[in-house]
Amino acid sequence: DLRMSRGLGDVYKRQIGSNRILLNYITGVLPELDVYGIRQMTMEQLFIRLLYEDWDERKYRFHLLEKDDEKNAQKGNREWFHDLELYCAAYEQREISHEEVYLENTKTLLVGHVLINTYLREHPDLSMQSKILMLNEVLYSKYENEVLGKQISYPAKVKKALDKKYASFFGDGKWKTSIYDFYREFLQVQAVAGKEVDIPETSFDVYDLAALAYIYKRIKETDPVREASHVVIDEAQDFGMMAYCCLHYCLRGCTYTIMGDTSQNIHFRYGLNDWEELRKLVLTGTYDAFGLLRKSYRNTVEISKFANDILRHGDFAVYPVEPIIRHGAAVRVEKQPDATALLEETVHTIRKWQQDGYETIAVICREEKEAAELAEQLKSYMEIVDCNPGTTEFGDGVMVLSVVYTKGLEFDAVLLYDPTQKKYPADNGHVKLLYVAATRALHELVVLYHGNLSRILTDPVSKEKKQKVFASETLTKAKEYEKKTFTQKEIEQQRRTEADKERNARSYIGPERIEVSAPKEEEPDLSLIHISEPTRHAQISY
């Protein structure tokens, strides 16, 4: 596993996971760690929250992006985010006027090209609507200073019209376009550029939601809300850079702890297969750190060896893992003559585990449909935990899950159900799926099947084949520093510096400071000046 920390603070506000089952599992562990007050949500739910009033749960819903959807998978990469950035920047350039503004009926320049561009350049973090409001305030203050300072008078109706004109010259601050229509227009532009994806109407995947949250924050928002001071992301490899770029923009000023394992990236086409891009995005501070959690405390030596043999079938690099020495039962791989025998042996194996005292048991299938059908069959023989991904609470008992929903979980015993060649062809994506399934087991792992077993599990790996390993030199150590003490004089100087910064910042959004000059001293009456010899000192009497 990997742990990536950015500015670790005292307050944890958000825990982000890939699905509700994982979050419910984490929630059960947190009280044991004496950690309270943490809000947990999936990445989809977080982006929905960032849409605020623009999300209508009666009208819209979200769905999971299909794993084999190559066309829509391109929405998860960083290039897609870059395209969205450029599209929003071009839109802002068109919407915000850059023309010089003169006081009506005069040649007095109120705001010029240079000033407008300076304000826009110096406030890149503001949304388009916030920039419009800022420019309106700057222009109106210039207008008021000009009119009041030079005592220019207008008829009441003219003055009222001018006030209205300059108060909303750059726009009224209310964006009338729907973020959904704006997003669909962006997707149409992408299609023309040869990057066609499905255009959603009322159902959105995580990358649609990420884009919508970015558009809201980048274009529409006028009243920013600080959602969190620290965010913890688990199973980070499941999300592509598009999600992280949008999250980084929407939660600016937030610190992060990001954890994951690229060997368990089951979304091979759009998840993270290495950490380089994410490191460059978030690890920018002096005391940010990137490190490895090498020790694996979950699996027995036998299960760990079986899982690592699966991993060696891939041609991708991995981070080396050091399992602790804990031996257990050998992994059992057993073929059944037909589907009926497969079901009977599944029931027999589960009952034996229950007799042995195992409290958490998982039967792992390839797809959700297969898991649901098998769960219905097993209910005739034993009690099965409800495994609805949206509502399930992790707990004791027998769970029948698709491999996708087992990520991040661990069970006393795991039965890998019918992993045939058809379900798990020999490619990198399915290598990672089988690796995830195998590493869920704490004590016992059994593989039951009928038909042709996946070649990932049958084909031997050449002893000459070397597993690609990421270089350890890429790690960074968290920096240590001593707390610096300041003298009272240094503290006062810092306060004066901060006050100057605040005063300069306020000049952007309010009237300029009025410089008040000290009154000139009156010339003294020369009759009251007496020059005395020989010193010739001037003595002035008042």
Predicted regions: what is each one?
Residues 2-12, 529-542:
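Single conserved hydrophobic/aromatic residue that forms the stacking wall/gate
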